A protein has these predicted regions:
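A nucleotide- and high-energy phosphate-metabolite-utilizing enzyme signature
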Residues: 1-177
């Protein structure tokens, strides 16, 4: 697929979930200059100056699909998915990206690929309350720390907190008393 063909695809048939995914996209290897040019070409696709109600409904539909797949059980200390579960990492990222898609077409200062910098920019622009951003940042940092500790325990990618019989040892390992 050529760069031109990819740009035509996104302009003519790109989906809203792809717009959200492209918020975090950036060139990291290979021809960085060409990668940057490609990302620049996608800006009109990702950062629309106006967002219609169908796009907002589509974004909400994506969230509902995630919720159905994961279930909507209240978070539990035991056996909870810190990444995809209720109140998890992806919910915070999804919130930030949705706000970016809503406001970022008219305000380039909101187009950061990082979740925490994006939330801070949304506060500066007056779109997110400072206390909401502070709570989300605290939760995001704690969840990421727990995620990393979970992965260190078994030396594999996992996002599930341990069941009750292993929880105490993990909590101590993660720095909790």
């Amino acid at each position: 697929l050529s760069v031109d063909a990819a740009e035509v695809y996104y302009e003519s048939a790109g989906q809203n979930w792809e717009r959200a995914a492209m918020i975090k996209a950036r060139p990291i290897a290979g021809d960085l200059e060409s990668g940057s040019a490609f990302m620049k070409g996608l800006r009109p696709f990702v950062w629309r100056r106006s967002l219609d109600f169908n796009a907002i409904q589509d974004i909400q539909s994506i969230k509902r699909q995630i919720d159905r797949k994961q279930g909507r059980e209240p978070p539990s200390a035991f056996g909870h998915n810190v990444k995809l579960g209720r109140g998890g990492i992806r919910e915070i990222e999804f919130y930030a990206q949705t706000q970016q898609l809503i406001w970022g077409g008219r305000d380039a200062s909101l187009r950061d690929c990082g979740t925490l910098p994006a939330l801070a920019a949304l506060v500066r622009a007056g779109h997110v309350a400072a206390n909401v951003q502070a709570d989300l940042e605290t939760a995001y940092r704690k969840l990421r720390t727990i995620e990393h500790r979970l992965q260190m325990v078994d030396d594999r990618q996992t996002h599930m907190t341990p069941e009750a019989d292993e929880a105490y040892g993990f909590a101590r390992f993660a720095g909790y008393e």
